[in-house]
Amino acid sequence: MYKNKTITCVIPSRMSSSRFPNKPLAKILGRELVLRVADSAKKSKYFDRIIVATEDQVIKDLVESEGYEAWITGKHYTCNHRVSEIASDLECDYVFNLQGDEPLSDPNHLDYIIEYGIDNELDMVQPIRKTLEGDNENPDVVQVIVNNGKVLYLMRIPEVITENVYPQLGYYFYKREVIDDYKNLD
């Protein structure tokens, strides 16, 4: 909770990644990736609840065996659709979508994103970073075209390189009703 606002962290995770199948169960220093992400989320000062959202029973079983909450969802092409599916069933003011492949998330960064979003009364926060050499040619780095602080477009390989293209970070922070409405955009 931050400023009397409840915050649920949802970690979307699936086994069928095209670039790295079974990625959530890959071990990092002896612990599965999805658990490392949940462990990072647990260090935030503000999350009232942490839920792993998955279409895979094996992930749900693993997560629950470690004391975390997990929900089964339908199959989805994007993480935001997976999070949106469960958003209407959440009793919270905000939802933080923490990507299931972000095991090195600094809890201070997560907390800053929450503070920034709530303090500025934003509907959504999607942080970006400086472009590094090779980012624009790397299909594993999602690029964002930004104009006046607003995200206009996301892509894997930029079709046009401009000064307004930045790599995104694997974090999305929403007012619950905003992510709940996301499923209606299809």
Tell where the protein language model's regions lie, with residue ranges.
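Short phosphate-binding loop-to-helix
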Residues: 51, 57-115
